[in-house]
A protein has these predicted regions:
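Extracellular attachment/recognition segments
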Residues: 1-100
Length: 100
């Protein structure tokens, strides 16, 4: 079993959501199975703006790309009760990949 951890950063943005970002993780040995697990998150409205929390979406998934590489996709969205993605939000999503 091989384990590695990572962090995906989402810079401030408004106008759409949830959004996705990827990070490729390379293991020193060949793998045949892998799973990405969410280990933490830091989410906020940018610039210290004070809003109600209407909807928060955070998740991770993994896909094997080659003999020793996994692409981790993080999904993140934060909005208030307006139903629109009109407020700047940013954050980080922490993950671990377990592979064998």
């Amino acid at each position: 079993m091989q384990i590695t951890q990572g962090l995906i950063t989402f810079s401030p943005m408004s106008g759409s959501g949830p959004r996705t970002a990827t990070e490729d993780v390379t293991f020193p040995n060949a793998i045949t199975t892998a799973v990405a697990l969410l280990t933490g998150m830091n989410v906020e409205y940018s610039n210290g703006d004070d809003h109600h929390l209407g909807n928060l979406q955070v998740g991770v998934s993994g896909a094997i790309l080659g003999s020793n590489t996994v692409r981790v996709t993080a999904t993140y969205g934060l909005r208030d009760w307006s139903g629109n993605w009109d407020d700047d939000y940013d954050g980080t999503v922490s993950f671990v990949v377990v592979a064998s």
